[in-house]
Amino acid sequence: MDAKLNILNQYFGYSSFRAGQEKLIDAQLAGRDAFGVMPTGGGKSLCYQIPALLSDGVTLVVCPLISLMKDQVQALKKVGVPAAYINSSLTPNQIRRAYRNIEDNMYKIIYVAPERLLTDSFLSTISRVHVSIVAVDEAHCISQWGQDFRPSYLHITEFLNYFEHRPVVSAFTATATPQVRDDIIHYLGLQSPVYVVTSFDRPNLRFDVLKPSSKEGTVIKLLQERQDKSGIIYCSTRKDVDNLTDTLLDKGFAVTKYHAGLPEVERHENQDDFIYDRRSVMVATNAFGMGIDKSNVAYVIHYNMPQSMEAYYQEAGRAGRDGSEAECILLFSARDIITAKFLIEHSSENEELTDEQKTQVQKQAMQRLVKMISYCRTSKCLRSYILEYFGESHPESCGHCGNCNATMEDFTPQAKIILSCVGHIYAMLGYSVGITMVVRTLSGSREERVLNLNLDTLAEYSQLSKYSRNDLRDMITCLEALGYLRTDPEHLGISLTRRSREVLVDGARVTRAVEEKAAKEKKSPEKSGKKLSKEKDPELFAVLKNLRTQIAVEEHVPAYIVFSDATLADMAGKKPASLDDFLQVSGVGSVKAAKYGERFIAEIRDYIAVNPKE
């Protein structure tokens, strides 16, 4: 067997690589720099862990997140890989001990925070060992144009200059615009890197956008239907996190919370409660989750609209990391737009940026917000919208998202009135106005600004007054998503496009999604061509989960570190009767087979004895 495949199987329990992994691994093993852009849950970590195990010396992994370092090192140690992390969570004595171990060549993989790179003690220690690879995780943090710019990442550039013989440098990110990708290559000094961008499609994720009258009531209903599953609920503000958590606790749900305003000790305790499955639901701001590799998250609910598609897809992508079917549900209201704009306008406080750079960053953030709003209001396939945003083509319908399972309504007459109104406002004023002013005109508002601009004299004034303002906003944003309107990213004025003529003159019909079909009419994942992992024997699956929990408690590790839900589902389906059979289960390598095989096989044997096949 090929050496890298042998490592993949022996340590990680998989028989084949995912898209893009092998090319990136081969590049580093051949001494080439590498740059991988892969979605959250796409298997980025294996792209540097396997080369590390097949290379002389040590691999340094630069990572901004204490939680991710802890998680990755814990998982590596479980499969017998000597690994360590160095960050501010360690005491001075622990750091000194780690440095001694590094000098004694006791580790193959060392995770390090970027702030640590240029310290005298770290530089002195690293100078005494052979570093074969420097892997940069969350590489988009090096770009001031990225949504998570961290000035400490710029230390990596200077750190690399300390090496007399430059190691292989690899970079990985789940989200990066062309400008951010250029920055990554420039600041890291990547030398003719092997560049891989894999598909951003996550077939096991089901996307939906809901517009409920009561978000709180909707969340309660969603959680009642998912009582036995683990999930994350993202809120835009700390206040929403606190209020929603209190409400859900009062209703008896096993929830905890996380945001930057909590004391550090409480944050860590709450995070551990979620990771160790003591609490099934985490309510949090976006301060939570980056670097959390909890594989059994069955759903991610966004209580508010995020500020960008990049942020949304990264956060939603924390569901279904083990390949199991998972849900990504966004609860949208017009108030979310106001909150998002406020947060953007008050986010440019990075002292590392000039005023001009801050203005540019804010402008780009507003452009991303426009696309995020369109996602919330589009009637087209949500999966297609996401993939097109990230530069991929995709069939018009996935047959599996909320919009694909929705009833379509022809609203051509209303669309013509809206387009005419937008065109006539521009013709009369000489400039475009925002969506709010168009809605007020169409609904017949008598507000002062409408009258001052003489918008009540237009033929379209009050023609759509029977519709709610939210409904009118949905229609307008749907027209934008379909390409019949556009929003100026700087001034947020809406205007006609070349395609507007298709509706106004050429007779094109326009439809939008208005409600989801009955559940029985929804296409199953299998029918839509998306084969999703499901346990074939639910009762045995539950038995195996209980055993996994026992082992996790005994070893003081999260349950998913022992085996993922997807591995247990495959185990329940295959019912291995020997260690050789056990090794055929996806996600079981030789180390875990030797450690846990007999206990799981015995549990399966006992289950079959009590539940023989009919």
Where are these regions (language model features)?
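Flexible coil/turn residues that form the inter-helical turn or adjacent wing/linker of helix-turn-helix
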Residues: H165, Q227, S379, Y431, ...
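Short helix-to-turn junction characteristic of helix-turn-helix DNA-binding domains
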Residues: Q28, L223, F274, C376, ...
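Accessory DNA-binding and partner-docking regions appended to nucleic-acid-acting proteins
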Residues: M1-K4, I338-T339, N350-D355, Q364-M366, ...
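Helicase motor core with emphasis on the C-terminal RecA-like subdomain
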Residues: D2-Y11, S15-A19, K23-S45, L53-S55, ...
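Short, charged low-complexity linear segments at domain edges
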Residues: Q360-F390
